[in-house]
Each structure stands twice: as C-alpha cells, then as structure tokens.
Amino acid sequence: MKDSVLKDKRILAVDDEPDVLEVLREEITMAVPTCVVDTATSYDKAMELLASCTYDLAIFDIMGVRGFDLLRIAVNRDYPIPVVMLTAHALSPEFLKESIEKGARAYLPKSSLGHVVPFLEDVLTYEYGDVWRRILKNVEGIFSSSRGPYWRKPDEDFWKEFDEKIGKE
C-alpha cells in the first residue's frame, strides 16, 4: 500500500461545531496517523494558529467562523495555503461561486465527511481543474435537485468562463 499524500502534513480545520472538528480529526488521523490536524472553533483561534504554525492545507467552514475572511487570509499569504471550504447550511451555487472567486481549492459538503481523506488527497494531488471538475460533478446533482436544472442561469457568464478555465466539457 502506498503512502498517503497526507502523510506528515499539517492541516488546520476551523468550524464552530466541535462535533464536526472531531469527525474531521478522527477520519484523517485514523487513516493517516502521521497527519497533524489542528482545530479551532472560532475566527480568533484560527488567526492565532495561522500566525504561529505552517499548514499544508486548511479546511474552513463557511458559516459561523468567518470562513471567507479566513480564506482570503490563507490564499494571500507569502506561501498560500490550499483551502477547502466546508459547508452544510451554505450549500448553494452562490456560496460555491464565492468560494471559487475568493481562491478556494475545493468545496466540500459536510454530508461527505465520511469521504474526507480521499477528497483531501485529491485536492493535494490533482491539478486545479481536475479537482474542480470532480467537485462540480458532485454538486451539480445536488443543485439541480434543489434548484432545478437551470441553477447556473443567474451567473451564466461566470459558469461558462469557469468551465473553460477548468477544461469542463
């Protein structure tokens, strides 16, 4: 069995729900014991950790911890941190678009936490376009069910340009 790309990595996970952080930590460290997962339940604690540690990857909840503010800070550092935006209540085309525009590397519904390890491995392994094509394949079904088949229509130009950027057919 080959080593995980998460081996010896350090991840920052930020969510205002301690249960979610515990699931993330357990899922990741059970699969990859040498991966360190630091957690924060607030924006302030996350800022403290970002200032004192070096991270290979970050996972930020969109709601409750100022996830978009943390995203902006993480991607605008001298050494940008790849960021996965995590969401349950903010699972919408609007928040997906904002995540993309602000530089997120990926977008993960909380309902997919059971698959977080292979998801994070993909984020660190695959190119930007490959990761986003996989994510869109997943969320398009969710959005089509909840919003109808024309969920892209309000931001049609953005989605067309993004599809071209990631090489989506």
Label each PLM-derived region with a short phrase.
Residues 15, 58-63:
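Active-site residues of response regulator receiver
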Residues 48, 63, 68-81:
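Short amphipathic alpha-helix used as the core "switch/output" element in two-component signaling
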Residues 25, 39-57, 65:
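Acidic, metal-coordinating helix/loop segments flanking the phosphotransfer/catalytic sites
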Residues 125-169:
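C-terminal output/effector regions of signal-responsive regulators
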Residues 69, 90-118, 136-137:
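Alpha4 helix (beta4-alpha4-beta5 surface) of REC/receiver domains from two-component response regulators
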Residues 58, 83, 107-108:
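Two-component signal transduction core modules
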Residues 2-28, 39:
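Conserved acidic segment of CheY-like receiver
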Residues 86-88:
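Hydrophobic/aromatic residues positioned on beta-strands within the core alpha/beta folds
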